[in-house]
């Protein structure tokens, strides 16, 4: 229906061959506001490490940016702050590789949310605002990957109709 084809990750398999070889680290890979805690000493703690793995730190940064959904200005500031704090070995092709990982995160969300969102729309009642946020998130992700893999694009209103129909 969406035009993802039988090999939706084919683009990413090919494009991953151009990623820069940088030092790998233990990464969380699921950092978002719900997985970051501050204790009474104002010390940060990262919880829920079930997706932790050994890999490219840029994947972890992209996953955080994708899941946290910063405003564009905040996103740019965060990326610049991160770049300022990283050793030189992590900065080669930073922007290009980060964009790859952001697209990869969008693809993963589309695949997961195409199944998940109709189910949760059927089972739960959301405010109109929350429905709009979920549909905008979905359509933004689908529209982001469309030029890369040739799938459909959508609007938040159309996504809502799909979720209601599929649920």
Regions found by a protein language model. Name each.
Residues 112-167:
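ATP/Mg2+ or Mg2+-diphosphate-binding catalytic cores
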Residues 58-91, 103-125, 140-145:
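Active-site activation/catalytic loop segments of kinase-like enzymes and analogous catalytic loops
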Residues 1-28:
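An alpha-helical support segment within catalytic cores of ATP-dependent transferases
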Residues 25, 30, 35, 48:
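Conserved catalytic-loop position in the HRD/HxD motif
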Residues 91-105, 129-133:
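All-alpha amphipathic helical-bundle segments outside canonical DNA-binding/catalytic cores
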Residues 1-2, 22, 53, 132-135:
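A cross-family kinase active-site recognition segment
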Residues 41, 48-53:
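Activation of the activation-loop gatekeeper triad in protein kinase-fold domains
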